[in-house]
């Protein structure tokens, strides 16, 4: 099973005898399995450490240390992180990933995690990779300054991108739904390659060069 890693696909294998291969694809359709547009953005924030980062900021800024009574809070944040990452991996795969990612099982008065073949850290890293290719996109294309909004979004509306893909690329709904954000960006750049304008980095470079020349002229005029 070959994964197209350039567009975000991942292939993982169960190395045990009789084990199978799994293909994970962070498509627009897979993103909708995660939840509502708001939940998709919340999931992205969670798997990139937003909850833990907030706890650390509070402790370091207000308390100046990490008190013992906060350990349960870190444990809950870690459990939420793992559970969310498991959700992302399963959303991106058509097969049941329980043998690989494990599962949460009720036991007496608590819920415990029964591990699969993959280490927890690998589950987290792969979930981050999938969300980056599924929501943000990692295509190496020029981002023009005029297209930058600088605004944070609270929603990721996958269906809007599916509709855009159908309109721009003449795809049917099923084909468009299987695109990842990275693939969508690459197709868009290929169809509209001659957009004029500057990226943020290009604009800043030109501005810095202009200001440097201006300063040199003024310094020379004062001599």
Roles of regions detected by a PLM:
Residues 1-62, 76, 84-92, 99-198:
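An amphipathic, hydrophobic-aromatic interaction surface with interspersed Lys/Arg
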Residues 64-80:
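Intrinsically disordered, low-complexity acidic Ser/Thr-rich regulatory segments
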Residues 201-223:
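Long, intrinsically disordered, low-complexity Ser/Thr/Pro-rich regulatory/activation regions
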């Amino acid at each position: 099973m070959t994964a197209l890693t350039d567009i975000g696909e991942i292939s993982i294998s169960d190395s045990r005898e009789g084990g199978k291969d799994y293909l994970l694809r962070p498509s627009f359709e897979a993103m909708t399995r995660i939840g509502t547009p708001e939940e998709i953005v919340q999931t992205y924030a969670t798997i990139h450490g937003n909850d833990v980062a907030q706890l650390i900021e509070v402790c370091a800024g207000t308390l100046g240390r990490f008190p013992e009574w906060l350990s349960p809070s870190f444990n809950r944040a870690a459990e939420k992180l793992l559970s969310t990452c498991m959700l992302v991996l399963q959303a991106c795969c058509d097969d049941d990933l329980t043998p690989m990612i494990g599962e949460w099982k009720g036991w007496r008065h608590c819920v415990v995690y029964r591990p699969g073949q993959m280490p927890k850290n690998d589950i987290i890293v792969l979930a981050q990779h999938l969300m980056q290719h599924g929501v943000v996109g990692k295509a190496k294309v020029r981002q023009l300054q005029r297209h930058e909004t600088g605004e944070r979004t609270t929603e990721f509306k996958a269906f809007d991108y599916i509709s855009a893909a159908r309109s721009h690329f003449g795809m049917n709904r099923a084909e468009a739904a299987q695109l990842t954000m990275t693939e969508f960006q690459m197709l868009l750049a290929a169809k509209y390659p001659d957009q004029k304008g500057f990226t943020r980095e290009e604009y800043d470079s030109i501005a810095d060069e202009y200001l440097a020349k201006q300063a040199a002229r003024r310094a020379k005029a004062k001599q």
